[in-house]
């Protein structure tokens, strides 16, 4: 990055309802969007033919639109199904990459469904306990500590 930024340099970009830092390199700037990790950001930049050394604020509007179309429709750009974060969706059986607010909604809907059907995972979420088989005898305690009274 040069010491003097040109006039069209954007310090903060608004992409998919998220503020993206324009001073970061494009691959790492995309990771600030929920649902996009480093691996997906890397492959999206390669598919869009964007220079990886460019900063996010240096991108043109056309390049940003190109990146967002690839994120919205990754299967059309030959990104494999195993790369996506929503595989064989419960309702429609489709493969998709869910990002930003849609990711929060899908996660909340999944947890509500698990709670509604009284699934073991759903019940653990409902009770506020650990879900993934961790031990809970000594760790994960909340509330006031109860001391041991001394014998007299």
From Swiss-Prot:
Q: What is its main location?
A: cytoplasm
Modification N-acetylserine, positions: 2
Matches recorded under Pfam families: Ribosomal_S13
Keyword Oxidoreductase in annotation = no
GO MF annotation terms: mRNA binding; rRNA binding; structural constituent of ribosome
Kindly list the places in or outside the cell where this protein is found, as annotated in its UniProt entry. Answer: Cytoplasm
The cross-references to InterPro entries, in alphabetical order and at most eight, read: Rbsml_uS13_C (IPR027437), Ribosomal_uS13 (IPR001892), Ribosomal_uS13-like_H2TH (IPR010979), Ribosomal_uS13_CS (IPR018269)
Task: Write out the GO biological process terms.
Answer: translational initiation
Does Transmembrane helix appear among the keywords? Answer: no
Q: What's in the GO CC field?
A: cytosol; cytosolic ribosome; cytosolic small ribosomal subunit; nucleolus; nucleus; plant-type cell wall; plant-type vacuole; plasma membrane
**Keyword tags:** Acetylation, Cytoplasm, Ribonucleoprotein, Ribosomal protein, RNA-binding, rRNA-binding
In terms of HAMAP family, this protein maps to:
Ribosomal_uS13
Q: What does this protein do?
A: Located at the top of the head of the 40S subunit, it contacts several helices of the 18S rRNA.
Q: Into which family does the record put it?
A: Belongs to the universal ribosomal protein uS13 family.
Which PANTHER family does the entry mention? 30S RIBOSOMAL PROTEIN S13/40S RIBOSOMAL PROTEIN S18, SMALL RIBOSOMAL SUBUNIT PROTEIN US13
> What is the designated name of this protein?
Small ribosomal subunit protein uS13z/uS13y/uS13x
Species source reads Arabidopsis thaliana (Mouse-ear cress)
Q: What is the lineage of its organism?
A: Eukaryota, Viridiplantae, Streptophyta, Embryophyta, Tracheophyta
